[in-house]
Amino acid sequence: MSKSLGELGERIIGQYLEKKGYRLIETNYRTKLGEIDIIAYKGTIIAFVEVKTRRSQSYGMPCEAVNWQKQQRLHRVASHYIARKGLINYDFRFDVAEVIIGKEKKIHYINNAF
């Protein structure tokens, strides 16, 4: 996947979340531990979102790329973020957003993916 395709998917999901009433806190939050594509909140929920973008489903569903190792890395980065920001009184969840950009755009958003 090209960087520009991934960036396009992240922009699409950012807009999708805003339409659903979320506010984006961070995009491409990076530490030495890894990266989280989008951090957004709505009410007392903070969602750490991994975005997977593909041109087709020829090689399987995009969410299949979020394996156990990737999940562990996301947990570590999120824990770092929570501690750094001193976040309390929030519920946290990990979501996966799939974007297929083919003849038509398809979005599949999975709340509490892991």
Curated annotation (Swiss-Prot):
Residue ranges the record marks as coiled coil: none
Name of the protein: UPF0102 protein Amet_2739
SUPFAM superfamilies: Restriction endonuclease-like
GO MF terms held by the record: nucleic acid binding
Family (UniProt): Belongs to the UPF0102 family.
HAMAP family: UPF0102 (MF_00048)
NCBIfam families noted in UniProt: PRK12497.1-3 (NF009150), PRK12497.3-3 (NF009154), YraN family protein (TIGR00252)
Regions crossing the membrane: none
